[in-house]
């Protein structure tokens, strides 16, 4: 469950600021973009949310963003897609929304990936059971996402 957090940072002196949003699980494209702008650790990098779902490298993108976030000058904010992912997997009352979510979201995304990887499409699980298994599988990823600031 998400608890809203806010980030305040005061910076003195000259600096270069790179702001990226809407990566949506396209890790390869994100890495190309960072090379194209010649990102270096001395730059300030803000990832303005929506780095999950839609693409076919969502779990890898989460891990990459989490590694970047360990740097002093990288700030990651939660977007609506991260909020939705967290809510869908941590609020039991939303478990029944998983089938609709799988229909609405593109053929990719980490929920779909784990759903198929764990063979949850066999019809033998309740929606609450499916939610729990996916949440357990993505425990570390959800922990990272749920602690991101929103501003």
Task: Cite the ranges covered by each PLM segment.
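N-terminal active-site segment of His-dependent metallophosphoesterases
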Residues: 1-64
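Active-site neighborhood of divalent metal-dependent phosphoester bond hydrolases
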Residues: 55, 59-62, 67-151
């Amino acid at each position: 469950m998400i608890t809203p957090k806010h980030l305040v940072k005061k910076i003195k002196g000259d600096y270069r600021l790179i702001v990226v949003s809407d990566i949506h699980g396209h890790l390869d494209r994100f890495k190309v973009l960072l090379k194209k702008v010649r990102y270096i650790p001395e730059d300030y990098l803000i990832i303005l949310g929506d780095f999950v779902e839609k693409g076919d490298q969502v779990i890898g993108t989460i891990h990459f963003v989490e590694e970047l976030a360990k740097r002093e000058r990288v700030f990651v904010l939660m977007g609506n897609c991260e909020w939705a992912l967290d809510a869908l997997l941590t609020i039991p009352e939303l478990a029944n929304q998983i089938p609709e979510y799988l229909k609405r979201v593109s053929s990719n995304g980490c929920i779909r990936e784990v759903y198929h990887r764990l063979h949850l499409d066999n019809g033998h699980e309740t929606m609450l059971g499916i939610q729990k298994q996916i949440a357990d599988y993505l425990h570390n990823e959800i922990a990272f996402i749920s602690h991101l600031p929103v501003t």
